[in-house]
Every structure is written in structure tokens, then in C-alpha cells.
């Protein structure tokens, strides 16, 4: 007679649970990431199927590079929404989206560069250039820049927006277990049910969609948008600086996973490997026409809830995501979600992005009685919001017209001021002690 499995101390080898349980656990992780992952293409105009494929393949690539040690799922990053909005002119110019994807690919390569620098110079020396006084205000700016688009979507149907918003709030505040981990998915489902009752859903496209199809579309790929044009160069300057914030998000998420599992992944397999894995996954996603990838805090919540820490379960979820991406009819169903629901979800989402930036500053005890820190934060916020309101700065380089967005200017100004102003006493802690990451998601 076999001994009963003790879940209290965590399961590090899930194979002992048997194949049926493994598949169920993998499906659970897929549902945890699902709401947030498909919301990004709905907000940006990218393909849901491509996004799911990139999330699945990106997660598997991440696990290969990290030697299969880190139980992390890579899904769509909300941090780049502001960049996509600027490049596509809030969706008015969807033909520019491939240029944004190409820039996302180069952002991923920036991760790889920083990974190499960490390997050569050490993590503490590199992280001094990206302290919370710089990354916090950048994250705050991302949410504030996106705020008008949330209101625009809400205006199409305030009832659906309110139901979606209220459901997310209730799940976050009073939810228990998986309900608390899946607020976006539940918010969409509840408000979608209301939309069905009120006749706000158009099913015409579902009948026309096939059951099986290839999720990659050549015309949407970032690979073929790398052409040296003005649109491509401007997209690079708009989107690549966002990687500064998302790299710090990555560090926070890896610290959260480390604290949850009880293993220091920042040291083993090392932050250089996790950054490289995330970066290459993001580069691949951009080239294929998907959004940037990032380690998902939702799945860390599932780890804490189930106490099953085997990365194999995450890889099963990644395979499920890949399989689902080959069903165009499923994408058609997702695309029937009314914009009012998207507005309600993004209403709280965009606000929480800014709030998480504030949390980043508070948790790291940034001293705003120090004039140095006040100046850096003030310049970042005004550059981001001010220049965004006037369309950024346009200048010529070698006959090519380049536009720097407000976010790009803010990031560059923050890094420069942090480097030249005296008093940079930030010391990066490579020993995570809490389960709180710097996740840019609800």
C-alpha cells in the first residue's frame, strides 16, 4: 500500500501524482494566465491565437534556458500597452502594429544584453542603474498614459463596464482561493453573461471561423517590419525604454516565486539565465507578431495555493496554450467580447499599474525627503505625461525622422539623472524575503 502524499510541505516532483492530476493541474495554470494573456491582444489589436502560441512557446523556451528549474509561466505583458497605443495611434493605425512587434523583439534582446552584463559585472553593479526611484515613476506613468483609453472603451456601454469593474473588485477584495487569483477571467465571464442577456454580443464572425488554422500571419509578423524605416525607428525609441521597467518587474516576480517555493532562483539558476529566458521569449514573440512576454504573478498565486512546485506542471499549461492557439473559432469567440467589458477591466487594470508603481517605491523605502529622489521622480512624471500629450519629440537622424515618445524621454531622463546626481546609495538585495513581486497585472 502506497504512502499518502503530504501536501503540507509542498510537492516538488509532481509525477508521483499521476497523469490525470498532472493534466488537471496544468489546465488550472492555463486558466490562471488566460484572462490576462488574451486581454492584451484585445486591447492592442493583435491576434489572440498568435498571443497564446507565443505564451506557450515562450514559456517552454524559458524553461529550457533556466534548466527546467523555475516554475514560471510567461504570458502577455501589460507594461507595453502604452507603447503599442502610441505606435498604433490608439488603434487608429493598426498597420503600424508589426513595427511595434519588431520593437518588442529588440526589447527582448535588451534583456539578453543586460543578462550578459550581469554575468560579467555582477548583479549588484548593474542594478544600481535601475533603482526604484527610476522604475517606480516609469510604471506610474504607464498607467496614467493609458487611462484615457479605458474611459473611451467604457463609454460604449457603461453597464457592462460597471459589471466587469465591480466583479474584478469583489474577486480581489473578498475572493478566496482560485477566485482571488482569477479576477480578470471571472470579471470577463460575468460581464459577458450580462452582455448575452442584453443582446450586446455579435456572433456573426464565429460561424465564419474555421475550427483549425495556423496562428501565425505573415502580414502581422514583426520579423518583416525590421526595415529601417521611420516607423520602425520611431517604434524602437518608443517601446524599448519600457524594457527598463519590465526588467525590474521580472526581478520582482522571480523574487516572489523564490519566496513562494523556498528556493533562491535569483542565485540558482541565476538572474542572468531568467532574464535571458524572458528576453529570448519576448524577442521570439515580437518576431512572430505577438506581444511581449513576462513572468506571471497569477501562476505564482496558484503555486502558493496548491503547494505543487514542480515546473513540469507549468510546461503542461504551456502545451495547452499552444494547442488552443490553433483554433480560429476560439479566437473568434474571444473577439466577440464587447468593448464596454474591455473598458471596465482596463479601468481598474490601468489604475493598478500606476498603483503598483507607487507600491514599488514604498516597498523599497525610497526617501522623498531627499531632494535627489524628488527631482528624479518629478522629471520622469512630467516628461512622460507632458511629452505624451504633445506627441513626443521628433528629430532627424541620417535623413530618417525619429519620434521619441513621452515614456522613452522619461526613461532616458531618469536613468541619466540617476547616474549623474550624487547620492545613489541603492543596493540590490539578491536574497528575496517576501512573496510580493512587482507584477504589472491585477
Predicted segment positions?
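Interfacial segments of multi-pass membrane proteins
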Residues: 84-91, 172, 299-314, 320-325
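Hydrophobic, membrane-embedded alpha-helices of multi-pass small-molecule transporters
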Residues: 20-33, 160-164, 182-183, 215-253, ...
Amino acid at each position: 500500500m502506497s504512502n499518502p502524499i503530504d501536501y503540507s510541505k509542498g510537492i516538488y516532483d509532481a509525477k508521483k501524482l499521476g497523469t490525470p492530476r498532472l493534466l488537471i493541474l496544468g489546465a488550472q495554470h492555463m486558466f490562471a494566465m488566460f484572462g490576462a494573456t488574451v486581454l492584451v491582444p484585445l486591447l492592442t489589436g493583435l491576434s489572440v491565437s498568435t498571443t497564446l502560441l507565443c505564451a506557450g512557446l515562450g514559456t517552454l523556451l524559458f524553461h529550457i534556458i533556466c534548466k527546467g528549474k523555475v516554475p514560471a509561466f510567461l504570458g502577455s505583458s501589460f507594461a507595453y500597452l502604452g507603447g503599442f497605443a502610441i505606435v498604433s495611434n490608439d488603434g487608429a493605425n493598426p498597420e503600424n502594429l508589426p513595427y511595434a512587434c519588431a520593437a518588442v523583439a529588440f526589447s527582448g534582446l535588451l534583456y539578453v544584453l543586460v543578462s550578459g552584463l550581469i554575468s560579467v559585472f555582477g548583479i549588484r553593479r548593474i542594478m544600481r542603474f535601475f533603482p526604484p526611484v527610476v522604475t517606480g515613476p516609469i510604471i506610474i506613468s504607464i498607467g496614467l498614459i493609458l487611462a484615457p483609453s479605458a474611459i473611451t472603451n467604457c463609454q460604449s456601454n457603461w453597464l457592462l463596464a460597471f459589471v466587469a469593474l465591480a466583479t474584478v473588485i469583489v474577486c480581489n477584495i473578498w475572493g478566496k482561493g482560485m477566485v482571488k487569483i482569477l479576477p480578470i477571467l471571472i470579471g470577463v465571464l460575468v460581464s459577458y453573461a450580462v452582455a448575452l442577456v442584453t443582446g450586446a454580443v455579435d456572433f456573426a464572425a464565429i460561424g465564419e471561423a474555421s475550427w483549425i488554422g495556423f496562428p501565425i500571419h505573415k502580414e502581422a509578423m514583426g520579423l518583416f517590419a525590421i526595415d529601417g524605416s521611420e516607423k520602425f525607428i520611431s517604434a524602437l525609441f518608443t517601446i524599448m525604454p519600457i524594457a527598463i521597467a519590465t526588467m525590474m518587474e521580472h526581478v520582482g516576480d522571480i523574487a516572489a516565486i523564490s519566496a513562494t517555493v523556498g528556493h533562491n532562483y535569483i542565485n540558482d539558476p541565476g538572474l542572468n539565465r531568467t532574464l535571458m529566458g524572458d528576453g529570448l521569449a519576448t524577442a521570439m514573440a515580437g518576431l512572430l507578431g505577438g506581444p511581449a512576454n513576462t513572468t506571471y504573478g497569477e501562476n505564482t498565486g496558484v503555486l502558493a495555493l496548491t503547494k505543487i512546485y514542480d515546473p513540469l506542471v507549468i510546461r503542461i499549461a504551456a502545451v495547452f496554450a499552444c494547442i488552443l492557439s490553433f483554433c480560429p473559432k476560439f479566437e473568434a469567440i474571444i473577439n466577440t467580447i464587447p468593448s464596454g467589458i474591455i473598458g471596465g477591466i482596463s479601468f481598474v487594470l490601468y489604475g493598478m499599474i500606476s498603483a503598483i508603481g507607487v507600491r514599488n517605491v514604498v516597498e523599497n523605502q525610497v526617501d522623498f525627503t531627499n531632494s535627489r529622489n524628488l527631482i528624479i521622480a518629478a522629471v520622469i512624471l512630467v516628461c512622460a505625461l507632458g511629452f505624451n500629450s504633445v506627441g513626443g519629440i521628433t528629430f532627424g537622424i541620417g535623413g530618417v525622422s525619429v519620434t521619441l515618445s513621452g515614456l522613452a524621454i522619461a526613461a532616458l531622463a531618469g536613468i541619466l539623472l540617476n547616474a549623474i546626481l550624487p547620492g545613489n546609495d541603492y543596493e540590490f538585495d539578491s536574497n528575496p524575503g517576501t512573496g510580493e513581486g512587482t507584477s504589472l497585472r491585477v
